[in-house]
Amino acid sequence: MNIFRITADLAHAVAIVILLLKIWKSRSCEGISGRSQILFAVTFFTRYLDLFTSFYSLYNTVMKVLFLAGSIGTVYLMWVKFKATYDRNNDTFRIEFLVIPSIILALIINHEFMFMEVMWTFSIYLEAVAIMPQLFMLSRTGNAETITAHYLFALGSYRFLYIFNWVYRYYTESFFDPIAVVAGIVQTVLYADFFYLYITRVIQSNRQFEMSA
């Protein structure tokens, strides 16, 4: 079993749990970008279209269900149950600037021009940039609750750890997927400034997370 993939998936699962608990216990989705959460839900819906048509392993199926259910649950809590607490004034990133290029790229650059493959490729491109509305929202508000920072760190760690998974698979299986690798690197780079601030301010100084001016 690939320990790097398992660790990355666990980091992703932890991020989802942190976010859901944060919203449920505080009865508020303040500080969370509803637009990013919609993009994540679209990402996993289009990536896991094969959930009911293909079976690879129990682990794979459980993770697919967890990520999909977690994303849908988060969208429900933010846009339905606790919508009165959603900060629409600061969550203003134009997501069509992310969705449309992802669609175009998926149609042009893919492994095979078939519906399921194009949808999978689209999900990879979209996930790479889905965090941008959240980071944009942080830049507008200037700070975030510590629990929100923990969520974002766990989410960023998941993608960072997947880089080690790809390196491991390359050396053990001679497997290399340039689409997933390039998109993953782009996604990790987007988190770089956040990682630095998280480690220096939240972890080392035990302060509230604040974006630099």
From Swiss-Prot:
* Topology with respect to the bilayer: Multi-pass membrane protein
Q: Which BP terms does GO give this entry?
A: protein retention in ER lumen; protein transport; vesicle-mediated transport
Do you know which PROSITE patterns this protein is assigned to? ER_LUMEN_RECEPTOR_2 (PS00952)
What parts of the sequence cross the membrane?
3-21, 36-53, 62-80, 97-110, 118-137, 150-168, 179-199
GO MF, one term, reads: ER retention sequence binding
Q: Name one Pfam family in it.
A: ER_lumen_recept
Keywords on record? Endoplasmic reticulum, ER-Golgi transport, Membrane, Protein transport, Receptor, Transmembrane, Transmembrane helix, Transport
Superkingdom of this entry's organism?
Answer: Eukaryota
Question: Any idea where this protein resides?
Answer: Endoplasmic reticulum membrane
Where does this chain mainly localize?
Answer: endoplasmic reticulum
What is any one of the record's Gene Ontology cellular component terms?
endoplasmic reticulum membrane
Cytoplasmic topology ranges = 22-35, 81-96, 138-149, 200-213
Q: Which residues lie on this side of the membrane: Lumenal?
A: 1-2, 54-61, 111-117, 169-178
Q: InterPro entries, alphabetically? A: ER_ret_rcpt
Purpose:
Required for the retention of luminal endoplasmic reticulum proteins. Determines the specificity of the luminal ER protein retention system. Also required for normal vesicular traffic through the Golgi.
- Homology family: Belongs to the ERD2 family.
Name-wise, this protein is: ER lumen protein-retaining receptor
